[in-house]
Each structure stands twice: as structure tokens, then as C-alpha cells.
Design a protein with these regions (language model features):
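Polytopic transmembrane helical bundles with strong interfacial aromatic enrichment
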Residues: 1-144
Length: 144
């Protein structure tokens, strides 16, 4: 069995799951903020947000990192001599920080201390898309 391809497949599955959450959670925040007067809807959004963040996004982020580190180990540390890998890691670290920021937003919505507008959440919803596009092009083309 080719373990490299196995771990690469698992890494990609984890990345896709993580990205789905990073793209969807801010959209739920938009609906949450736009329906603050509807208590029943807010309770549903809180459940959706919590489950998405803790049961899909967090495990997907952890397994993305885990399988990514395993792939680096299999490839050998000399992969760090390539600039594209440094850029990719920087972008993945940025996505991780963004993920944690969404966790802060989740908590502020839960505690009713949120000061962000639905427009804000619509705008930050584009961040992971741009980063994903950059990562894909960097990994496929390895331009530098």
C-alpha cells in the first residue's frame, strides 16, 4: 500500500471539510445577526454554529494539520528549502488564526456581546475563498 497517497487523500478530505466549515460558519453568522429579534431562530443558529465549529471544523482543522505534518515527514524536511512551501504554511497558519477568530465571534454571538454587522460577516466570508485559491495555485504550480 502506498502510504503517501493514503495520507495525501486523508489530508485532502480534511482540508475540504475544514474549508466547507470556514465558508459556511460566517454565512450562519450573517443570518444570526439579521434575525436578532427572532429568539426561536437565534436558538437554532446557536446550535448550528456550535455543532459546525466544534464537531466539524475543529476536528477537520486538526486532521488537516496532522496529515499535513505526516506528508511533510514522508517527503522529508528538505521540502522546506522550497519557497512555495513556506508561503503555503504561512497561508495555512493564517487560516488557522481565522478559524480561531470565528470561534471568538461564535462566543460573542452566544453571549449576546457581538458588535459586528451582517455586512462584516459577509465580507470576512470571502477570506477563506481567496486563501484557498492562492494555496491551490501555489501547490499545483510551485512557482517559486
Amino acid at each position: 500500500m502506498n502510504f503517501y497517497l493514503l495520507f495525501k487523500s486523508l489530508h485532502l478530505i480534511a482540508v475540504i471539510s475544514w474549508m466547507a466549515g470556514l465558508l459556511y460558519l460566517p454565512r450562519i453568522f450573517v443570518y444570526h445577526v439579521e434575525n436578532l429579534e427572532k429568539e426561536e431562530a437565534i436558538e437554532i443558529f446557536k446550535i448550528m454554529e456550535r455543532r459546525l465549529y466544534f464537531f466539524i471544523m475543529r476536528p477537520a482543522m486538526i486532521t488537516t494539520w496532522l496529515f499535513g505534518v505526516i506528508l511533510i515527514y514522508i517527503n522529508g524536511l528538505d521540502i522546506f528549502s522550497q519557497l512555495w512551501m513556506h508561503i503555503k504554511l504561512f497561508l495555512v497558519i493564517f487560516l488557522t488564526i481565522y478559524h480561531e477568530y470565528l470561534g471568538i465571534c461564535l462566543k460573542s454571538l452566544k453571549l449576546k456581546t457581538n458588535t459586528k454587522s451582517s455586512k462584516f460577516f459577509r465580507i470576512i466570508n470571502e477570506v477563506p475563498t481567496v486563501i484557498l485559491i492562492l494555496i491551490i495555485f501555489i501547490v499545483i504550480f510551485k512557482p517559486i
